């Protein structure tokens, strides 16, 4: 399935595909760029905060309507990052977001802008020193819930994985 030029339709399609209301680590940040409704989708813990802040600054400072002509023109002139792709296939967008990329949809664009701003937690999951098991995965989680979730999301890139706060 491909995206449309209508923001509300695209927003609903991606929210359903990503199951946005079912996981607290999936961020759907609605913003306005040059008077157009837009939304950023990303997984908390898998994106670099500094890069997101810089990108958001650029988005809020867009003042030329001609940059909003197409996603390609917008990307070329307004996305201050090297690793960027314009994608209109919903499955590719979902895969990108679940693998740590940031997706931007903008009203009037029939494609999303994928920004590779991913970062992975600093350590690998290790087998715990105590409670060793003979079979199965040798993963141990011990940091904050966001870090633990990022480690799990890094391995399981499935929109059916839902996480609710307890």
What are these regions (language model features)?
Residues 1-166:
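Membrane-embedded alpha-helical signal segments
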């Amino acid at each position: 399935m491909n995206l449309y030029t209508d923001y509300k339709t695209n927003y609903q399609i991606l929210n359903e595909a990503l199951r946005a209301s079912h996981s607290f680590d999936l961020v759907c940040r609605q913003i306005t760029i040059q008077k157009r409704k837009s939304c950023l989708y990303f997984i908390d813990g898998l994106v670099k905060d500094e890069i997101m802040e810089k990108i958001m600054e650029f988005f809020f400072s867009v003042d030329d309507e001609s940059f909003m002509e197409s996603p390609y023109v917008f990307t070329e002139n307004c996305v201050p990052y090297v690793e960027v792709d314009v994608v209109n296939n919903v499955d590719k967008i979902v895969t990108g977001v679940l693998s740590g990329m940031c997706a931007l949809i903008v009203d009037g664009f029939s494609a999303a802008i994928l920004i590779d701003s991913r970062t992975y937690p600093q350590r690998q999951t290790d087998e715990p020193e105590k409670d060793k098991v003979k079979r199965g995965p040798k993963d141990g989680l011990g940091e904050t819930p966001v870090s633990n979730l990022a480690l799990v999301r890094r391995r399981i890139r499935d929109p059916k994985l839902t996480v609710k706060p307890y």
